[in-house]
């Protein structure tokens, strides 16, 4: 092991893609606010799997239709490609079943010994994981009240948010 990379990781499932049924009314001289009809159309949900490199502050996203072991494995593959092969990647995460499933263990068995090290947060201790505050900020800044025309548009906007955040990472 040349370096020890530490990544704070979690999932944010059930991000709703919601579209308007009528166009928003723009502000005018009489009213300075955007008016939005209370009616909306649900287009489905997406799941976000994400990590923050605790040394560099870089946020690493994976948007998925599902929230399963295969998605978690896909995220591990992203980390594996991102960091030099001789480094150990320590991941701080919760006790979600996908993190210890047979499928995940089979994948980890194919990796060099010591490539991934999992550090589990205590039960009811998710607030100890830095990614949770990132998700909270993302919800306030970007997801709350968002309207899109398709799930694809929501996915694109999530990835764009990560690109913007990573221009000036906070560590």
What residue ranges belong to the model's regions?
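RNase H-like polynucleotidyl transferase catalytic core
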Residues: 34-40, 110-130, 146-148
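RNase H-like two-metal-ion nuclease catalytic core shared by retroviral integrases
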Residues: 46, 94-95, 118-140, 152-154
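Short, basic/hydrophobic alpha-helical segments
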Residues: 70-90
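Short, aromatic/basic amphipathic alpha-helical patches
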Residues: 102-111
């Amino acid at each position: 092991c040349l370096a020890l990379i530490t990544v704070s990781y979690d999932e944010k499932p059930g991000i709703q893609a919601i579209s308007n049924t009528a166009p928003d009314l723009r502000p005018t001289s009489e009213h300075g606010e955007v008016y939005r009809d209370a009616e909306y159309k649900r287009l489905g949900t997406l799941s976000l799997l994400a990590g923050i490199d605790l040394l560099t502050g870089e946020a690493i996203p994976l948007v998925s239709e599902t929230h399963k072991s295969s998605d978690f494995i896909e995220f591990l593959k992203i980390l594996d490609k991102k960091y030099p092969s001789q480094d150990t990647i320590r991941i701080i995460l919760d006790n979600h079943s996908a993190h210890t499933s047979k499928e995940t263990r089979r994948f980890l068995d194919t990796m060099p010994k010591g490539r991934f090290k999992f550090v589990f947060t205590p039960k009811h201790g998710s607030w100890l994981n830095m990614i949770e505050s990132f998700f909270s900020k993302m919800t306030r800044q970007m997801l709350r009240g968002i309207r899109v025309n398709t799930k694809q548009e929501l996915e694109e906007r999530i990835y764009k948010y990560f690109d913007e955040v990573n221009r000036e990472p906070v560590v």
